Amino acid sequence: MSMLRYLYPAVCAAVLTGAGAVHAAPVDLTGWAENGLVNNGAGIWTVQPGNDSVIQSRNGNPTVFYDATPAGASAQGEQLSGSIEVLTTGDDDFVGFVLGYQNNEINSTTADFWLIDWKQNDQNPAVDGLALSHVFGDLTTTSGSGTGGWWNHADPINEAARGTNLGSTGWNDQQKYTFDLTFTEDLIEVFVDGQLEISYSSTDHGSTFTDGSFGFYNFSQAQVEYAGITQTTLPPTTPAAVPLPAGLPLMLVGIGAFGWMRRRQAA
């Protein structure tokens, strides 16, 4: 019986060693910060024990709770995961997320980030359902009565896509949903309860996406919990070659020499 039969699995294992598994790491939300339209304090974000969950308790203007740590300023190449739940039955407005967000960008005259928002019920001119919008331009124009385009996705909040299944379906009171957000310079993906709802590429957009932080978003909706937040580094788009272990060439030479000797003895 050929020795190769026994050595082949060992060779394969040696090649694969070091490829490494990807693991989700808990996110410490104590380094995150609130920004509110017009003035900070539009939302009250209270980090919960364990530091990987937060509850937003104010019904007010658009508010963002974003990763303000130096490491969090570049979220591209990462996936943010966790759960979202509206804990009350008393309102029906917007919950969601931001991608590629910079400090105080919600009040910028030159904003450029992405908004994922989900409304429970129609409320003219706002409609229910899950949507992705490009927030681009002067947001100081949105601070008037009714907070402008935040309500109905009017410029400079420019709707780009709606959820495949939830595009016209609102969230339910006191129901926990899981979410996974993929963000690279070329791709935004939104999964809800394991189902891909939105997949939007730089080709769809016409250019690559601007980098920035992950964040949570509420508008006119209180008692929203984001829980069990984790972050995972995504594998590269083009997988890098796995380097050969240092001893592998000698192992292969030995296998070749053994085979040559067996053939010579059999001759």
Tell me the role of every PLM-derived stretch:
Residues V15, A19, G31-A33, A42, ...:
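N-terminal regions of proteins, emphasizing targeting and processing segments when present
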Residues L16, F94, V98, S213, ...:
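Short glycine/serine/threonine-biased micro-segments
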Residues R264-A267:
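Short, charged juxtamembrane terminal tails flanking transmembrane helices
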Residues G18, G82, G215, A257-G259:
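Small side chains
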Residues S2-H23:
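Gram-negative bacterial Sec-dependent N-terminal signal peptides
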Residues A241-M261:
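A short, hydrophobic C-terminal helix/tail in secreted or cell-surface proteins
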